Amino acid sequence: MHQSIDTAIGLNLLHANQAGADHNRAHFDEWGITCLNLMSSPGAGKTVLLEKTLAALQSELKMAVIEGDMTTELDADRLRQYGSPVIAINTGRSCHLDAKMVAGGIHRLQEDYNPKEFDLVLVENVGNLVCPAEFEVGEHSKVALLSVTEGEDKPLKYPVMFQEADCLLITKTDLIPHLDIDLEKLAANVRSMNPHVTIIPVSAKTGEGLDTWFSWVKSQVKVPMIVSI
């Protein structure tokens, strides 16, 4: 009985969140913004990837960041150095951002900026391999990060995030010489559950794969149609 009640409550929460996510996405679509949701376990490299992305693409794209952490604005402060607006959201005990939280972030962005000026909103979700994948926030694409130190079996143990991802970044590849890891096996494990995912090995330290990542990001951004009169 209790299990049935818990299941019903969980489904209601997911349904309500999905409605909120659809509402957020409708706003993004109205404004011509692409939203990417970055997800990973803690320490996989989301923040440093965003630093590299903001630095590399700021002359080409107008970007904003919604930065999720349980507490502090440490990561948000790091990202603010690159000049793009960064909205920090502290989730408290929650292990993920949800659509309502991100809606609040959108409203805060609207207070100081015209959202139609932006091309891209990058959401850095709370570090967790499970919860963020189950709660959409209004994104157009999900980006998962997995560091080589986590092993090639992680996608099999925590499948939902890797099943949902549109792009997987295998991070910290500069550490491979010091580890016993098989990248081909890792990629095969991911493709066994998500055959169409884009997989990009990257190293923020050496720069490996970053240009490929930047190209993928730009390929996702909505390009306004120019109508000739």
From Swiss-Prot:
- Pfam families in UniProt: cobW
UniProt-listed GO biological process terms: protein maturation
Q: Which Gene3D superfamilies match?
A: P-loop containing nucleotide triphosphate hydrolases
Signal peptide per UniProt: none
Which sites bind Zn(2+)?
95-96, 131
Positions binding Ni(2+) in this chain are 95-96, 131
Q: What InterPro entries does this protein map onto?
A: CobW/HypB/UreG_nucleotide-bd, Hyd_mat_HypB, P-loop_NTPase
Note down the stretches annotated as region G-domain. Answer: 35-200
Q: What does the UniProt keyword field contain?
A: GTP-binding, Hydrolase, Metal-binding, Nickel, Nucleotide-binding, Zinc
Please indicate which superkingdom the organism of origin belongs to. Answer: Bacteria
An example molecular function term from Gene Ontology annotations? GTPase activity
Q: Which residues form a coiled coil?
A: none
What the record says about disrupting the gene is: Disruption of the gene has no effect on hydrogenase activity or urease activity.
For this protein, the record's CDD domains field holds:
HypB (cd05390)
Q: Which PANTHER family match?
A: HYDROGENASE MATURATION FACTOR HYPB, HYDROGENASE PROTEIN ASSEMBLY PROTEIN, NICKEL CHAPERONE
Q: What does this protein do?
A: Involved in the maturation of the nickel-dependent guanidine hydrolase GdmH. Required for nickel insertion into the metal center of GdmH. Seems to be required only for GdmH activation and not for activity.
Which family does the similarity line name?
A: Belongs to the SIMIBI class G3E GTPase family. HypB/HupM subfamily.
Q: What is this protein called?
A: Guanidine hydrolase-activating protein B
Species of provenance: Synechocystis sp. (strain ATCC 27184 / PCC 6803 / Kazusa)
